[in-house]
Amino acid sequence: MHVEDFTSAIHPRWQRYLQGKGELALTGHSLRLVNRDTNCDAYTNAQIDDYQGLSRRRFPWRPPLYLGLRARFSHPQAELCGTAGFGFWNDPFMMTGRRLPTLPQAIWFFFSS
């Protein structure tokens, strides 16, 4: 089993993908994916992944697998705008690489306002 606890550093396997006012913050016991001072008119993203630059057939995670985490938002739902989520997907919309578009294959936990 692979365990990543982010207590001291972000392992080099994790590539950072930050847009707009997205930030990664190590707290000493966790990793926070932060979108600071944003509004509903601008895209922002704080992400780690391990598939940038890989062909889909080389993506590292395959079933069966287990993902355990603790997640929370810093504001009440009524103050959030946009989308947020975490999980596994096949990057169907070419967000982080030069791949042809494809149908989504995902297990994703998702928030949308």
Report each predicted region and the residues it spans.
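Extracellular carbohydrate-recognition regions
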Residues: 1-21, 27
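Secretory/extracellular carbohydrate-interaction modules
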Residues: 32-113
